Each structure stands twice: as structure tokens, then as C-alpha cells.
Amino acid sequence: MKQKLIILSADAMVTEDLSLLKTLPNYKKYLAGGVECDHIKTIYPTITYPVHTSVVTGCYPDKHGIYGNLDFTVGLHKQPWAWDHKHVRRPDIFDMAKKAGCTTAAVFWPVTGNHEHIDWLCDEYWPQGPEDTVHEAFKRMGSSPEVLSIIDRYEPILTNRVHPGCDEFLIHVAADIVTQFQPDLLAIHPANIDAYRHHTGVFTPQVDAGVIETDRFIGIIMDAVERAGLLESTNLCLISDHGQIDVVRNLCLNVKLVQAGLIRLDEKGEIKDWDAYVLSGGASALVYLKDPADKRVWQKTKDLLDGLCAEGVYGISHVYTEEESRREERLGGDFSFVLETDGYTSFADSWLPPLVRSFDTSDYRTGHATHGYLPDKGPQPVFLAKGPAFKEGFRTGVHPIVDEAPTFAKALGFEMPDDIDGKAMDELLR
């Protein structure tokens, strides 16, 4: 019997949510009695796009090259996102599945735009302005004519980046892909729980409603599996990427860089030149230098950041150099420094005063709760699975999130590359 695998990543679901989830009908029908990991250790930064790339590559950000949601561009008040798969530097589970002869699908899985080895693709993306259309937007990100016809069918329920409308859309698109094409590997990423935490806090009635919605999403997908006659051969994995922590303020550190002369503005308050720039990742931030080889600017920036950290009022608990974050947290890239939150501050990008701001729920980084912090902080992500590849009623202890890709691969009968960072959770598999 050829097995199939569905990965449903419920963004920002945490272990504390499972007590409610386990009372709900679709968990009981499709996941109860399977396997569960007590503690999944995620990556740094605890941000959706880097984590999901680690989930499918089995590698840390220093290898796969995704270390934030955004495609860094200086001077923009709204940064573009890293939607396209071209940013990923390592083979992922979709690449290896195709090499093994499997069919593949992904719906709203991060950083999969124009992925050549996903047969049925609906990238996490949205129209880029009032002139753009849903059809053209998803076509631009690699959706095939067959998938575009499904997207067109459900467009009326798609609310751009507004939850749960966009989640209802993606779940129905995924369900139709199951019934029409029966992919061997399907990865899905609803983000309703994540959005509710950003908007209302880590543990609130709205978050509980999101857990109930997620159970219903499981039911919609698995009903499609049953209608396709595939239940006995399908493995379902419910995972997540990170938790969140409540914060009390947002702090715009680029204001301090302007005051230090490291960012220079024109008469309209826009950036005309820069030496250093702080890009928020929510509860952490990356600091870029225009010329990383300029030792004078590097030292000036480091001295400023160390001073802000030492004062204890600017939201920074630790300043990492790129070399330190690469060595200690496997976070490396073309930035020069990483700033870690003090546990109650989130960072924002603005270079204009005021320095300290209240919540702005239009940006995931500046809501009532956020993430991006070191992976040992806050509530932790989940891993549950049930199906013919997995043991029954088995619990395991701590695993790094990079162990998920090789585990998924083994469940489908193939291997990830030898030089990945993760190892399969063999104790969970039959």
C-alpha cells in the first residue's frame, strides 16, 4: 500500500492548546491514539518563514538561508515578504519527494512561490494592490491552471490576510486538491491561531475559538481524504512552528540610529542614506550594515547597541554579532547583529519618533503578543501524528524541529540528504 502524508501546520499552536483540542471531534476521530512529541525545540528566530523552511529542509537558517519573513529593503514603510522559493538554499521535502517519484502539493506553505517540484501549488501570497487580482496573483506565484480553477471557485471566501477567511479559503482549496489529484505529500498552513494571539494575547477566548476552528479544518481535510477512499493509506501530522509571548510596548530602534547619524533623512523624513538599519522580527531584530566590511561603522554600531542594551530600558536583553548568533543559535546571514528582546518589548521598523509606541495589530510584529525570540522562551510548538507509518499510542520526549523533515520523508519511504541537521524520529515510526 503506497502511503500518503498530510502535514497541517497550525501556526502558533502550543502545547497548552492541546487540552482543548483533545476534547474536539476531529482530533478524536483522526489523531487520538497516535504519536505525540512532548517538546519540539524550534529554531532562532521563532518566525514563521524561517521555521517552516527548517521543517521542510531539516536544516537551520545558517544553511537554508531564510532568517525572517521579509525580503529586506531599506527605506520602505512596508517590507516585501520572502514569498518565492528562490530564496531557499537547500533541497526540501518537496524536492526529495519528487525525486522519489511522489506527487506533491502545498497550500499557503511559506516560501514555496514558483517551487518547481510542487505539482499543485497555492503559495502563501495575496494580491499586491487594488489593481491586482486573486487569479493573477496566484498565477504569478506558480499556481497551475488546474489549481487556479480551484482558487477561482473559492475566491469569494478569500479575505486577504484576514482570518479566518483566508484560512477557510486555503482549507477548501486543499480539500479539493485532495479529492481531484490525491497528492502523495500535501502541506497546509493555516494561521488563524497565530493571528488571534497577535491581536488579543497569548491565552484568550479568541485563541480558544481558533483551536476549535483548527479542529474543524482537520475535519474538512480528512473528509476529503475519506471521500477519495484514502483514509487507510493516509498519515496526518499536526504540527506548529512557534509559540508567542505577551508584550507591553513596541520600540523603534531605528530612531536611535538616526540620532547617532547611522541613518540620514531628507526634509520629508524619508531615508536618503544609511550605514546601519534595524529590521524587526517581532521579539528580535536583525541589524544590517550597508557595508559590512566597514570596520569603523561596524564598531560604532556595536558600541551603540551594546550601550542601549546596558542601559536596560531599550528592550534589548542581548546583542549578538552575526558570528555569535551563527555559532550559538545556527542563525547566520548577511546581517551583522541580532537583538534579543527583554521579554516584554517588541521591535518596530520606523525611523521616525516616537521611540516607544503602543500596539499596532495591522503588523504581526507589533500586536499584543508576538514571537521571534529565542526558542526556549514561552509556550512551545506541537507535533502529533497518526496513520499507517506511525506507532499507536506512543509519546516521545524532546526533539529539535529539524527532525521533522527526515521523519516525514521516512514515513513516505525516502530519505532527506545526508548533510541535513535533523535526524528522523525513528522511535515514532513503525
Residue ranges and their predicted role:
Residues 15-17, 49, 112-119, 194-198, ...:
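Short catalytic/ligand-binding loop motif for oxyanion handling, primarily in non-cytosolic enzymes
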Residues 71, 75-86, 90, 95, ...:
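Secreted, luminal/periplasmic, and some membrane-associated catalytic domains
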Residues 18-62, 105:
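Short, structured active-site-proximal loop/turn typified by the sulfatase FGly-forming signature C/S-X-P-X-R
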Residues 262, 266-296, 366-411:
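Substrate-binding rim/cap in mid-to-C-terminal beta-strand-loop elements of soluble/periplasmic
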Residues 39, 103-108, 185-189, 238, ...:
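A structural signal for short, well-ordered beta-strand segments and their strand-loop junctions
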Residues 2-16, 29-30, 55, 97, ...:
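Beta-strand elements within well-structured catalytic alpha/beta cores of enzymes
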Residues 60-201, 289, 300, 306-310, ...:
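His/Asp/Glu-rich, glycine-adjacent segments
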Residues 3, 24-25, 50, 88-95, ...:
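A structural signal for well-ordered alpha-helical segments within the folded catalytic domains
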